[in-house]
C-alpha cells in the first residue's frame, strides 16, 4: 500500500492581512506568519514585473534561511504601474492623490510576483510566477480625487488604492485575476502548491479546522481576521 504523506506546514512570508484572508478563502491557514523585512527599493530603470518577482523571491529566500523545519514558504509582492512607471506604495495622503491622478481615465497594470519554496531535508524547490491584471479607471473629477485621497484605505497599498474598497466604484474594466489585484493570485498559488506535492484535499479537510491555528493568525494581527 502506498504510504500517505502529510502536507508540509505552510509559512506565509508576509505581514499582509489581506493575503491571510485570501488564503482563508481557499481554506488554507498558514501554520506560521513570518514577515520578511527586505529593501523594496526598485533598482535603477527596473521594470514593474521584474521588480515584483525579485521582491517575492527575496522575501521567500529570507524566510527559508530563517527556518530549520521542513515547510512550504509562500511569498508575494504586488506592484502597480502606468506603462513602465512604477506607482509607489502610498504612505501619505498626498501620495494616494498622486497615484489616483495617474490612473484616472487610464489603463494601468497590477503585477504580483509569486515565489513558493518547498524546503525539505535542507533542499529547496522553487516555483515562481508573475501574474498581470489590467485595470481601467473612469475619468475622475477633482471632487472624486480629493474625496478618495482623504480616505485611509489607499495608505500602504500598491498604487495608492484598495480595489476591494471604495475605489471599486471607479473601475470600468478589469482583465485578469481579481485576487491578483488584492495581492495574491489564488489560481496560480494553488497550481504551484499542487506541483510541489501539496494535497489540497487534505488541507481543506484538516488544516483549516484547526482552531488553534486560526487563533495564532488572529493574535498575530491583534484582532480577528478570519471569518
From Swiss-Prot:
It is found in: Cytoplasm. InterPro entries: ITPase-like_fam, Maf-like. GO terms for molecular function: nucleoside triphosphate diphosphatase activity. The keyword Hydrolase applies. Keywords: Cytoplasm, Hydrolase, Nucleotide metabolism. Its cofactor is a divalent metal cation. The active site is at 77 (proton acceptor). It is an enzyme of class 3 (hydrolase). Its main location: cytoplasm. Pfam families: Maf. One of its GO terms (biological process) is nucleotide metabolic process. It catalyses: a ribonucleoside 5'-triphosphate + H2O = a ribonucleoside 5'-phosphate + diphosphate + H(+); a 2'-deoxyribonucleoside 5'-triphosphate + H2O = a 2'-deoxyribonucleoside 5'-phosphate + diphosphate + H(+). Its EC number is 3.6.1.9. Signal peptide: none annotated. Nucleoside triphosphate pyrophosphatase. May have a dual role in cell division arrest and in preventing the incorporation of modified nucleotides into cellular nucleic acids. NCBIfam families: maf. Belongs to the Maf family. PANTHER family: BIFUNCTIONAL DTTP/UTP PYROPHOSPHATASE/METHYLTRANSFERASE PROTEIN-RELATED (PTHR43213), BIFUNCTIONAL DTTP_UTP PYROPHOSPHATASE_METHYLTRANSFERASE PROTEIN-RELATED (PTHR43213:SF5). This is Nucleoside triphosphate pyrophosphatase. It comes from Rickettsia typhi (strain ATCC VR-144 / Wilmington).
Amino acid at each position: 500500500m502506498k504510504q500517505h504523506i502529510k502536507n508540509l506546514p505552510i509559512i506565509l512570508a508576509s505581514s499582509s492581512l489581506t493575503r491571510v484572508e485570501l488564503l482563508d478563502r481557499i481554506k488554507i491557514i498558514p501554520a506560521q506568519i513570518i514577515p520578511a523585512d527586505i529593501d523594496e527599493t526598485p533598482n535603477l530603470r527596473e521594470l514593474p514585473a521584474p521588480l515584483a518577482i525579485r521582491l517575492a523571491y527575496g522575501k521567500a529566500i529570507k524566510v527559508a534561511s530563517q527556518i530549520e523545519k521542513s515547510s512550504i514558504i509562500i511569498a508575494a509582492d504586488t506592484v502597480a504601474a502606468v506603462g513602465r512607471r512604477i506607482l509607489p506604495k502610498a504612505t501619505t495622503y498626498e501620495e494616494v492623490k498622486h497615484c489616483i491622478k495617474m490612473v484616472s481615465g487610464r489603463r494601468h497594470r497590477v503585477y504580483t510576483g509569486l515565489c513558493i519554496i518547498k524546503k525539505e531535508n535542507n533542499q529547496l524547490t522553487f516555483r515562481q510566477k508573475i501574474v498581470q491584471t489590467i485595470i481601467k479607471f473612469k475619468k475622475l473629477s477633482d471632487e472624486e480625487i480629493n474625496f478618495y485621497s482623504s480616505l485611509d484605505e489607499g495608505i500602504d497599498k500598491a498604487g495608492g488604492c484598495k480595489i476591494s474598497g471604495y475605489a471599486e466604484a471607479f473601475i470600468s474594466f478589469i482583465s485578469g485575476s481579481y485576487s491578483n489585484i488584492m495581492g495574491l493570485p489564488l489560481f496560480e498559488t494553488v497550481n504551484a502548491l499542487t506541483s510541489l506535492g501539496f494535497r489540497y484535499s487534505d488541507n481543506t479537510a484538516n488544516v483549516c479546522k484547526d482552531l488553534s491555528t486560526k487563533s495564532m493568525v488572529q493574535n498575530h494581527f491583534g484582532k480577528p481576521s478570519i471569518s
